[in-house]
């Protein structure tokens, strides 16, 4: 299955998203839905565990489990890892959705920089901690449109 990678221009999101090639270029081999979902989950877990940054408690638990520590440390590592990977996956999907809906930010470095400036301002506002990455990006986009 041929895919190409599209890098997301978000300063918090490190990595690239797999994007299927247009159907005119190649036709991917279809897999049953359950297998595709399992493969996507496995890929995103592998991807998030290979990030250049890892939360310190996750790294600590990871090293403990690698040294064959007791079962509880190993279990905590698996839980921390899965929570981190799930949050990473959700964040990445939300950012990808936003940039698919607003491709102008992927075409212009200047527009992207303006969006990121507004994004940072939104993050610093009281009450913004409960917003998802998509809502925060959308709020920054709406502010830019109002200018």
From Swiss-Prot:
Family matches, as Pfam families: InvH (PF04741)
InterPro entries in UniProt: InvH (IPR006830)
Keywords: Cell outer membrane, Lipoprotein, Membrane, Palmitate, Signal, Virulence
Signal peptide positions (record): 1-15
Highest rank taxon of the organism: Bacteria
Membrane protein topology class: Lipid-anchor
PROSITE patterns: PROKAR_LIPOPROTEIN (PS51257)
Lipid-acceptor residues (S-diacylglycerol cysteine): 16
Any one GO CC term of the record: cell outer membrane
Lipidation (N-palmitoyl cysteine): 16
Protein localization: Cell outer membrane
Family recorded in the similarity comment: Belongs to the InvH family.
Entry function: Involved in the synthesis of the type III secretion system (T3SS), also called injectisome, which is used to inject bacterial effector proteins into eukaryotic host cells. Pilot protein that is required for the proper localization of the secretin InvG/SctC in the outer membrane. Necessary for efficient adherence and entry of these organisms into cultured epithelial cells.
Name of the molecule in the record: SPI-1 type 3 secretion system pilotin
Organism: Salmonella choleraesuis (strain SC-B67)
């Amino acid at each position: 299955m041929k895919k190409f990678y599209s890098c997301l221009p978000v300063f918090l999101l490190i990595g690239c998203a797999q994007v299927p090639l247009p159907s005119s270029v190649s036709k991917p081999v279809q897999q049953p839905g359950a297998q595709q979902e399992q493969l996507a989950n496995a890929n995103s877990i592998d991807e998030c565990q290979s990030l250049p940054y890892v939360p310190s408690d996750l790294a600590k638990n990871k090293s403990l489990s690698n040294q064959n520590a007791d079962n509880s440390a190993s279990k905590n590592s698996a839980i921390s890892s899965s929570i981190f990977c799930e949050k990473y996956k959700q964040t990445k999907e939300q950012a990808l959705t936003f940039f698919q809906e607003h491709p102008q930010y992927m075409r212009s470095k200047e527009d992207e920089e303006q969006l990121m400036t507004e994004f940072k301002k939104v993050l610093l506002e009281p009450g913004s901690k409960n917003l998802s990455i998509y809502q925060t990006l959308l709020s920054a986009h709406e502010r830019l449109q109002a200018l």
